[in-house]
């Protein structure tokens, strides 16, 4: 028996471990929709959209802005602002501990990044929610960074684009977070009075106080395919009305069919489509869009499991 262990079993285990270690962590990704095993470098070329089923995966705020804005001339707004636990809030865990954990996980100070720059050469300011930071919830810093972006648009007479991905107002900041709904809505009213366009792009998911304020106040409301958009979640609604909801309820396609949003745009088309739209709204020449050259990638055989 001992010879069998030494000669057969142990070498087999060692070969298995070597095989596992030869596949770098994060090199493969499973699509949450069709479960296809995708090569990470190939997925990056498609902007985290599954090439098999067109599922638009969730991406971070910085990745979102990197995709949307021109490379040159970017400047982050409100980067110095940090959240403060003014209420000394505690549920199952202290709020300050939740903040520390979220900051460590994401590398961000809070759940919104605002950045000035250009889109196809046209001055623009953009904000993007970081859903990985406490569900993209809106607190005082998120509201303030949004307002600073809007004020930049007012001062520089340029359009404002926001990419929303949020579970709503941040519970741990109580009334302070609810006040951000009014604060962000008020600054968007100023943009409208000045005739400056605000485009709201709804990504998966957008709920609660964010959907009830800034996310649905765009002059044009755009959504990515299959994004979940609503106020309360489907399960909560079903329990309240005691009825089964229609298929695809709260998906962007359902909202488009019922007139709640204006258009659905794939991630790869956002730059040219919004660039043309903003140029028309600002009475500027149609910008020239040059599609990036995508070099072919040699995809190695996918592992059996990841």
UniProtKB/Swiss-Prot annotation:
Which residues form the C4-type zinc fingers? 31-53
Q: Is Isomerase given among the entry's keywords?
A: no
Instruction: Give the main location.
Output: cytoplasm
The record, for InterPro entries, names: AcCoA_carboxyl_beta (IPR034733), Acetyl_CoA_COase_Trfase_b_su (IPR000438), ClpP/crotonase-like_dom_sf (IPR029045), COA_CT_N (IPR011762), Znf-ACC (IPR041010)
Cell compartments where the protein resides: Cytoplasm
Q: Which residues bind Zn(2+)?
A: 31, 34, 50, 53
Top EC category: transferase
Q: Which domain of life is it from?
A: Bacteria
Manner of cofactor binding, per the entry note: Binds 1 zinc ion per subunit.
- Residue span(s) of domain CoA carboxyltransferase N-terminal: 27-296
Q: Which cofactor does it need?
A: Zn(2+)
* Annotated metabolic or biological route of this protein: Lipid metabolism; malonyl-CoA biosynthesis; malonyl-CoA from acetyl-CoA: step 1/1
| GO BP field | fatty acid biosynthetic process; malonyl-CoA biosynthetic process
Output the Gene3D superfamilies linked to this UniProt entry: 2-enoyl-CoA Hydratase, Chain A, domain 1 (3.90.226.10)
Instruction: Tell me its EC number(s), please.
Output: 2.1.3.15
Keywords, in A-Z order: ATP-binding, Cytoplasm, Fatty acid biosynthesis, Fatty acid metabolism, Lipid biosynthesis, Lipid metabolism, Metal-binding, Nucleotide-binding, Transferase, Zinc, Zinc-finger
Gene Ontology CC? acetate CoA-transferase complex
- Pfam families given for it? Carboxyl_trans, Zn_ribbon_ACC
One of the entry's Gene Ontology molecular-function terms is: zinc ion binding
What family does this chain come from, according to its entry? Answer: Belongs to the AccD/PCCB family.
Q: How does it assemble?
A: Acetyl-CoA carboxylase is a heterohexamer composed of biotin carboxyl carrier protein (AccB), biotin carboxylase (AccC) and two subunits each of ACCase subunit alpha (AccA) and ACCase subunit beta (AccD).
Q: Which HAMAP family match?
A: AcetylCoA_CT_beta
Q: What is the role of this chain? A: Component of the acetyl coenzyme A carboxylase (ACC) complex. Biotin carboxylase (BC) catalyzes the carboxylation of biotin on its carrier protein (BCCP) and then the CO(2) group is transferred by the transcarboxylase to acetyl-CoA to form malonyl-CoA.
Q: What is this protein called?
A: Acetyl-coenzyme A carboxylase carboxyl transferase subunit beta
**What species is this protein from?**
Pseudomonas syringae pv. syringae (strain B728a)
């Amino acid at each position: 028996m001992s010879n069998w262990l030494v000669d057969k079993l142990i070498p087999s285990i060692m070969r298995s471990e070597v095989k596992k270690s030869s596949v770098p962590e994060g090199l493969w990704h499973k699509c949450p929709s069709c479960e296809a095993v995708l090569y990470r470098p190939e997925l990056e070329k498609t902007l985290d959209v599954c090439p098999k089923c067109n599922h638009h995966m969730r991406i971070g705020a910085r990745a979102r802005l990197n995709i949307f804005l021109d490379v040159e001339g970017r400047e982050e707004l409100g980067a110095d602002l940090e959240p403060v636990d003014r209420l000394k809030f505690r549920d199952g865990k202290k709020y300050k501990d939740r903040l520390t954990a979220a900051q460590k996980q994401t590398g961000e100070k809070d759940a919104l990044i605002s950045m000035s720059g250009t889109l196809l050469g046209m001055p623009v300011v953009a904000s993007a929610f970081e859903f990985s930071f406490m569900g993209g919830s809106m607190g005082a810093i998120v509201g303030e960074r949004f307002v600073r972006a809007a004020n930049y648009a007012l001062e520089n007479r340029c359009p404002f684009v926001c990419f929303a991905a949020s579970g709503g107002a941040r519970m741990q900041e109580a009334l302070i977070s609810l006040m951000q709904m009014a604060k962000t809505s008020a600054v968007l009213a100023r943009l409208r009075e000045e005739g400056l366009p605000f485009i709201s792009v709804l990504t998966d998911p957008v709920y609660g106080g964010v959907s009830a304020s800034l996310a649905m106040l765009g002059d044009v409301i755009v959504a990515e395919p299959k994004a979940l958009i609503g106020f309360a979640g489907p399960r909560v609604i079903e329990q309240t009305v005691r009825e089964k909801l229609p298929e695809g309820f709260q998906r962007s396609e359902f909202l488009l069919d019922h007139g709640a949003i204006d258009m659905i745009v794939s991630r790869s088309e956002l730059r040219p489509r919004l660039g043309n739209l903003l140029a028309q709204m600002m009475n500027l020449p149609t910008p020239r869009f040059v599609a990036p050259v995508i070099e072919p990638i040699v995809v190695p055989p996918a592992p059996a499991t990841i």
